[in-house]
Structures are given as C-alpha cells and as structure tokens.
C-alpha cells in the first residue's frame, strides 16, 4: 500500500532470502523498515557509511514512489567492543559511547542521510530482552550453559541457515559461542545472555532471573525491531557481513518468539574496498568520515562516491575516485547555475524540452525501480544535461524551460540528495549594468571595451557566459 503519487510504479528489489529480484509490496502503510545501525565503540568508518548511504537510497526511493515509511535504526551501545572500551577507561558505558553517538549523528548529517524515525538504544530495552529470553527458556528453545550464560539452541529452529543458505544437517557444529561476531566455520548455539565476568566486564552488568550479565548483540536487534515495528516487518537491511551470523540469528530468535515470518524482504549492500584491498588499520587504509573531511573532501563528494555504484557490487574506494566525484559534482553545479540565470520570460515550455524532460524522468524512475540501479539513473541524468546544454546553446531557451528543468532536478534530488540549489540569484545592479555596457560594446564591435567590461565583472566575482539566447551571469 502507498500514498497517491504521480511517481507510482512497480519497484523491484533483490531479496537475499530468495536470491531473486522480487516485486515489492508493503503489507500495510507505512512500510516497516529496520536497518542495522552503528556499534558505538569508535567512530564509524567509510565501509559503514557505504551501507548507511545505500539504506538512505532505499528509503528515499520508497518515498519517491509514494510509500510512507517508518524507519527504525538501532544504536548498539552494549556489546563486546563497547563494554571492553568502557572497562579499559574505567568509565560508565553511557560516558564511553556518548561521544561516538554524537559523532554518528554529525556524520550522517554531513552525508545528507535522512534521519530515521527512531534510534533505539539497546540499553533502553534490557527489560524486554530479559522477558524474551525467559520465554525462550520456558519453551526449551534456549538453555543455561555451564558458564551460566543463556544460549539459543539452533537445533530447535529447523530452518536455521535459510537466509545464509546453510544446511544445518551438513555442518559440524561447535557446542556454543559467546562472541558477538563469528564466522560460518564456528556455527554453534549462540549467546542470548552473557553471564557477568568481573575481570572482563568490570562494573557493567544487569540483573536478571538467570543472573548478572548483559544481552547478546543478536537479541538486541530482534527485540528493538519487534517492539517498535511489530512481529513482522517489511524490509530489514544491512551489509553483507550481517547476513551471518547476525541476521540469521535475528530470524531464529524473532520467529521462535512470534511464530511469524520476521521480515518479508532482506537487502544487503556489498563490501567497500580501499585501493582494491579490505579496509584495515594495519594496512593504513582505514578511513573515518572525519579523516576524509580533514583532507579537504566534502560530505557531498563522499556521498556521491558511496552512492554511485550499485549496492550489490563491491565498491573500490580510491582518492582518484573521490577527485572524479568532485568533477562530476562540479558539472552538476555548473548546470544548475546555468539554469538559475535569468532567461527571456515565456508562459509555455518548448516542446523539445518538455519531451526531453519526460524521457529523462522515465529513464531515471525505471532505473531506480530496477533494484535501485543508481548507476543507470546517474547516466540518464548526465545524458539529459548534455541534451539540455546543447538546446540552450543553439535555441531560444526561456525562463519557463529553465523552471521546468529545475523542478525536475529538485524532484530527482529527493532520491539522490547530492544537488544544491540557490535561492533566487540576485545579481547586483552594478554587475548587470556592466553586462549591458558590454553588450552595447559587442554590438558596436568594440571588442577591447567589451573585454574590459568583462574583466570588471570578473573583478566583482561574477562570470559572463555568452550563448545564443544572450549573456548569462553566474557567481565565480
């Protein structure tokens, strides 16, 4: 179900659960979207932001096609890493994570990522997690191990492995695993409640019927999603590294608790590489957003780089790529600046511009409707820019044409989030008078004087661009 929209059309998304591209349909309005948020033990790195920008594109596309969206993104403020950091500094978990939470919100604003409706903190849902664990214990789906931690018995969930396409009966399972993160070779019963260890956990723990401790990472997302979106959601998204074990374990827990399908669609973005290699602090190719901003790149340029490739393709992050994005954005800014100049007034849009605009909007919409094919959408945009620039150069371009194209660009920017538009540009009278004097000199073929007026305009911070429809003025 969706709200009425002139952009309504079929949207196809690749569902990791079925390994196929499927027609998207929401169960009810609004679309229930849950995305895995940051683990706030450190500053988020650009690999994280590749996933967050993909999720932003997904959300913006849903909105573009007329869907209302309820978006939940969790804040993991208790796990192995956050707890270790707080204990190392001998401060509370809240004190340790607060700066990184604040930095995360600053970073997503820098990247023009639309905010979620709710950012639940895992530590705010501990009572609900304890209640869920008790239910799983009561139903013999979970058990208390010899180490006093509570574990989920994956053999009690016959379809375990369906998301990551693991066949439980074909695998040698370890007895259990307490770490939040592990690989398929260590497939095992996973921890729901990690028993308190004073040497490891210091002063950080919660009381529960099964003893002191803290919840497992996988349970946190299940409970926050179900508490805020209900037992069944429409879309769950994250990075490919979340498929196993995190999302696999979420399904097992959630469906054991509700006896309903947890999520109808699962979407995952591919890895980000740096100079063709996996990002690693030891290789010196580990970047936070702040590292790149300090090196002179803008949030807009970084967003463009993270956005421009299809989300299911690995993205190779290079400085050369960022510089290329800078040039692409300059081309976009120059085009918008050209459109924002004054043109001869007209009440009608030219037939050619009208047709080009409709063709472009269809190509753009069809591209993003095809599993968020942003590369094809951007190609359509640059083709349209080329066509429009050619039309402006050779034809009588009017204010109605310019306004029509600017409206189109503003519409597609609700998806892209990379274009910047000026308020109505006010060219100072002094500049416009010099432009008029230059035109008089040009008509009189007094080229030296015309060049002098052009230089005076430049000294005031403006550039004159000559076209068949007359001179255009833009700020340098």
Swiss-Prot record:
Cellular component, GO annotation: cytosol
List of residues binding ATP: 281
SUPFAM superfamilies: Anticodon-binding domain of a subclass of class I aminoacyl-tRNA synthetases, Nucleotidylyl transferase
Annotated cofactor note: Binds 1 zinc ion per subunit.
Molecular function via GO: ATP binding; cysteine-tRNA ligase activity; zinc ion binding
Compartments where found: Cytoplasm
Entry keywords, A to Z: Aminoacyl-tRNA synthetase, ATP-binding, Cytoplasm, Ligase, Metal-binding, Nucleotide-binding, Protein biosynthesis, Zinc
Motif ('HIGH' region): 38-48
Gene Ontology biological process: cysteinyl-tRNA aminoacylation
Reactions listed under catalytic activity: tRNA(Cys) + L-cysteine + ATP = L-cysteinyl-tRNA(Cys) + AMP + diphosphate
UniProt binding sites for Zn(2+): 36, 221, 246, 250
Top enzyme category: ligase
EC number in record: 6.1.1.16
Motif 'KMSKS' region, residue numbers: 278-282
HAMAP family in the record: Cys_tRNA_synth
Protein family: Belongs to the class-I aminoacyl-tRNA synthetase family.
Oligomer status and interactors: Monomer.
Protein name per UniProt: Cysteine--tRNA ligase
Organism for this UniProt entry: Chlamydia felis (strain Fe/C-56)
